[in-house]
């Protein structure tokens, strides 16, 4: 027989809180690369050269640096500051996710990974104006109905259905 169910509550869909020896870095779109916005690849290379612990990717496409020792903590935090790896992003950007789509996926009907950051840029100005900057709003975009970025679980979803065309899904409470 099974044991009695233990009580639990879901308070967030985010990654675990940072504790001593652990740091979570948000990776927009889940791709570690250097871009105009952030130099993630360079920063993580520098961190990996001094860090002896673990790195792992979360279900939300973020990177956790685990096992940070007191010896390396100051240097790692310095690299994080140097490359602005903890920016004051909106709740929408923190909860955005897109599949790789074009040009990488043969099933893609339209773009998603390259388009979502631009869409979030546009929406952020409205969020700030409405006082919703810190609201944890999940937005997902996918290049086809297969839903690799889990758009059907998001509060705001764009599902590709043809070149430059998307079905828009919203959640109402």
What do the predicted segments below correspond to?
Residues 1-173:
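Peripheral terminal and linker regions in Fe-S/redox and tRNA-modifying enzymes
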